[in-house]
Amino acid sequence: MFFAGFGCLIPFLPLWLEKVHGFSGAEIGVVLAIAGFSRAVAGPLTAAWAHGRSDRRAPLFMFTLLLTVGFGVLYVLDSFAAVFAVILVLDIAYWGLLPVVETALLRLTRTAKPTYGVARGLASAAFVIGTTVVGVLNDWSGSFWPIWGFMLVISALMIGGSVWMPREPVLARAEIAQPFGDRLLAGLGMLRNSNFTLFIFAAGLIQASAGFLYTSGSLVWANQQGMSSKEISMLWNIGTLAEVGFLMFLGNWSARFRPETLIVAGGIGAVVRWTALAALPPLWVLIPLQLLHSLSFAATFLGGMRFIQTIHGDDRAPTAQMIYMGLANAPTYAAAVLISGPLYDRLGAPGYLAMTAVAAVGLVLAVLLWLKRDTSPRTGEVPGQSNGRS
């Protein structure tokens, strides 16, 4: 359900803001960017709070309730300030759920079937379903209200899903009894690990380089290339299906490579992808470019998850994920989004070239991390991975 909602939120929220609320590209960029910057504060705070709960479902309850109330209120709002305030909360809540869901998948598939790659691939398939359903409903209804309705229903269903899930207690650990401030400092203390710090900014910049695509990609396809919602949905789905295929069918194969190698591959894919999209390629070229999502996102993502799990283990992985998303991924993504709106308004598709530069910086950092891969001791290896990898 979470990823089906993501399939609506990422490609269609900018269209909702433009078509229903009349926001310009710059205003859309401001709304999404400020929400992203706010995650830099909310991420570590949420991580410290969640790390002190005795039930791993606690963040699910909190975030899904916020989402349902937020989307319900969004229907009656009209002013820029009011919509901005609600989108801020919704963005923090939805992205706050992501590390909780991701680490739960990684943890629960460790000792049970399906494998993580298959489970994450199925989750990405739900993204495709969400994108397809909303795209078809938009065209069928001739409006953009299905975007709001779909997100409200998904958010409400996630509350029910959180209640239905069996309680998963956290094994006794000292952090639960620690004061909130101590847990917060312990989480931030992860940054003392230089490899972890280099990783979060390498992967963060590579993934943040998708900011123009997520903010203005649908607008470019609709307004500059005259595509329908169905065609836009198809392009998004091709990218996501490439992600699904990589995770489900190449996930185990990719385990022969070090996590750092996957991140480098993701950086290369991102540089090629954004450079080509800047040229307004025809549909037959857009299709293979969308397949590069398997590198720019999936390889970077999988490498990042394995890197975090390797150095921090099960108990600390959710906190490490939130620190990564809060202090590196969110601010860099927010900055990319902030410049994407004005770039789209002034340049259109050539604005992708700014994302090429962002991805290139991330690639350089990833190469530096790869070069350091044998210089620092690790706390362990993720099951299913072997030593001596490339």
What are the roles of these predicted feature ranges?
Residues 1-36, 195-233:
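Helix-loop boundary and gating motifs at the non-cytosolic
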Residues 41-55, 138-139, 246-259, 344-345:
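Helix-to-loop junctions at the C-terminal end of transmembrane segments
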Residues 58-72, 152, 261-276:
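Structural signature of the two symmetry-related core transmembrane helices
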Residues 75-87, 278-290:
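Helix-loop junctions at membrane interfaces in 12-TM secondary transporters
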Residues 318-347:
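A late C-terminal transmembrane helix in Major Facilitator Superfamily
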